[in-house]
A protein has these predicted regions:
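Residue-level detector of short, conserved catalytic/binding motifs and their immediate flanks
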Residues: 22, 140, 279
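Conserved alpha/beta catalytic core and glycan-binding cleft of carbohydrate-active enzymes
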Residues: 46-48, 234-236, 248-282
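Short alpha-helical segments and helix-capping/turn motifs at coil-helix boundaries
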Residues: 8, 106-108, 267-268
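The feature marks proteins involved in alpha-glucan
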Residues: 4-82, 88-97, 104
């Protein structure tokens, strides 16, 4: 790879194609060698594998123009929100893990939501994550829809179908912490690039790395990911997870306010509202 004048490394391949897998190999200053996924990649292998792969985000063509033009934040309207974990909502006997893909489950979910008068579906995090038991709250691929349930195009189809049936779609988003798995963000270049150095605020109560929101690398990644899901997948809102743990040091009000994180959250919200004025930020 070539190091650009502003510090970013780049590589151009004329032979690269959609579906091709890749990893980053990083050599630290001390000479250690690590392999990582692409935290900005649009697709990752099904766990326990973790290579990133090239995705064509223009493959699916949305047909929800009318919905997107007319939607609003619903702050002054009654909402009936159904929270869904896609992996356990309905068992698929034809799949060894019991999962339906995004396309297969769409009509089943929509039928259920309409029957019970739900106005919105709220999905537990759909970004890629290594552990099923985390329900998606410990991320490694912040721009990658989890491959457990199919492809990016299939997720777009699910959202599109919901909109055609006048059902809004919200996704849980995790801006506070990330998975400790070695191929992810943790000590990405051999230093504490996205997280805190070892301290009593470095590891969360869930055993994950807390984001250090004072660093520009972290701010860029998290706010870009939030914008990505709203822009590319037409989600109608994001529910920010574990915000109390971000506002206060260690989630403890007695320890005071984490001003860096509060500043980040304010700036991210302002930016998202400018770009997506009708999206809900919860």
């Amino acid at each position: 790879m070539t190091q650009e004048s502003y510090g970013v490394y780049s590589f151009v391949s004329d032979s690269a194609d959609f579906g091709d897998m890749y990893k980053y190999v990083i050599y630290t200053k001390s000479g250690e060698r690590f392999e990582h996924c692409d935290p900005y990649g649009f697709g990752m292998e099904l766990r326990p594998q973790w290579a990133s792969y090239i995705v064509d985000l223009s493959e699916y063509k949305f047909t929800d123009d009318k919905w997107m033009e007319c939607r609003n934040k619903n702050y002054n309207s009654p909402m009936n929100i159904y929270e869904v974990h896609l992996g356990s909502w309905l068992n698929n006997p034809q799949n060894e893990n019991g999962w339906y893909n995004y396309s297969e489950i769409a009509d089943k979910l929509i039928q259920y939501a309409k029957k019970h008068k739900y106005t919105h579906l709220e999905f537990l995090p759909l970004s890629e994550h290594p552990a099923d038991c985390s329900w998606g709250y410990q991320n490694t691929g912040f721009f990658s829809p989890t491959s457990r349930y199919g492809t990016a195009a299939q997720l777009m189809e699910l959202v599109d179908k919901c909109h055609k049936n006048n059902i809004g779609v919200i996704m849980d988003f995790v801006p506070v912490h990330f998975a400790v798995d070695g191929y992810g963000l943790a000590q990405y270049d051999g230093s504490y690039l996205y997280e805190y150095p070892p301290s009593d605020v470095g590891i969360s109560e869930w055993g994950t790395c807390n984001f250090n929101h004072s660093r520009n690398e972290t701010r860029c990644l998290v706010q870009s990911a939030a914008n990505f899901w709203l822009e590319k997948f037409h989600f109608d809102g994001l529910r920010m997870d574990a915000i109390s743990r971000a506002i206060y040091w260690g989630g403890d009000p007695a320890r005071g306010v984490n001003e860096n994180t509060v500043s980040f959250l304010k700036n991210m919200n302002l930016g998202l509202q400018k770009l997506h004025p009708t999206a809900m930020l919860i």
